[in-house]
Structure formats: structure tokens, C-alpha cells
């Protein structure tokens, strides 16, 4: 219920164009989500490190150099059969599928490894193994 309440506040702030309200709602959504996850599921001490792992994974979707972007364009087009193009966004390069501008993963993309934050015993307890 807390998260839904914060989402409603976010929606209202967006509709009003209230940038301070938007920031407040986003912070509250994050706080409620991470705080409840940590407390209700015994994840205290894991959430921040896991968040950083997910952030690093998401950042690996973009390319650090134009050369990597060009290589990604070629590879993704060959793999998927769809033409792709890249654009510079800030100091990064993002590869898009040309037909719908879907972001394509860089050749250097890596999936987040969230299991690293658990001991073998913790994983056994949650999977029932």
C-alpha cells in the first residue's frame, strides 16, 4: 500500500508539472521499496550493494566509445536481422534498433549477478534445496 500511495503522489506531481514533488515522490518510492525489501525479507546490508550491481549492469547497456558502438551496431544487426544505429548521449554511446528506437545492449553488456550477495546457506534456505 505504501508503494501505491507514493506512485499516486508521483502521478499527481507529474500531472501538475511539480518538479520538487516529482523528486520527493521518486525518493519516497525508492525509500519505501528498498526499506520494505530490506526489513520484510531480511535483506538489510544487501540492498545497496545489489542496487549498485544492477546500476553497473544497466550502464553496461550503453557503450563507452564510438568504436564499441559501431561494433555493437554490426553485431546486433547480424544477430537480430534489424538495422541499428548509435547516438551519442552525454559521454556515452547508445545503440538503437532503427525500426522502433529500442535500446540494444552493448557488446560489453553483463547481466547483474545478484546471487553474489547471498551465502550458499541463504540460497538453500530460500529455494528449499
PLM feature segments, named:
Residues 1-129:
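Flexible "arm" and connector segments at domain edges
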